[in-house]
Amino acid sequence: MAAILLDIDGVFHVSGEPIAGGADAVRRLREAGHRLRFVTNNTTRARATLAEELRAMGIPLDDDELQTTPRAAAHTLAGRRVLAMTMHAIVGELEGVELVGEDAEAVLIGGADETPETNIVFSYMNLARAFHELEAGAQLYSLHKNRWWQTKHGPLLDAGAFVAGLEYAADTEAIVLGKPSRQYFEAALQALDAEAGMTWMVGDDIDADIAGAQGHGMKTILVRTGKFRPDEVEASRIRPDGIISSIAQLPEWLEDHL
């Protein structure tokens, strides 16, 4: 039996539209005795909301099986004064963090979504305010640094572009709290009481999921859904341990290879 980390966006759904076979795959994995943890860089909705959306797709999971980056941020930044450029829906997840508009000790950048709120969160004035705080000595944190994400309308620009802009302007480097950071993967392993070498990461992102997990000694499986692009995989130096058509194929693949 294995410990398995499962990405969500692009693996189980795209823009809320389920990818066929996901719910059945999770049931089969549980029946086979595998230990599962759902790990996501989604930074636009609260954990309870994300978990409920997955259950509505027929995917059986408890809230505490879902690991999110806003909660990682709350743990890291507890007790600190933070200027947070995030979607309103996750503000409640930042428990213990003192959210401020000035004199911040840290600047926290969240993710984008497909709603008009993104235009407000990442407005020029908000980015300029974040830059001002960084110049005054605040430390830059990012929930993730994804360049783009896949939607039903095609790829959309993600928050990594704004993080890179602030890094360039303030001549600093962001501390990434989600995938592919070491602390995020270590938290997942600890939750499963698993060793890296006996753990599989399943995802659609060759960088955040596959390269990140391999960098921490895990085995990896790339799905041909979501962000998967054959040309990017071909050009990459990263080679997953397996490539499958979709999450639906995972139980059978593991039966053949474990």
Model region roles, listed by residue range:
Residues 2-34, 43-258:
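Asp-based, Mg2+/Mn2+-dependent phosphohydrolase catalytic module
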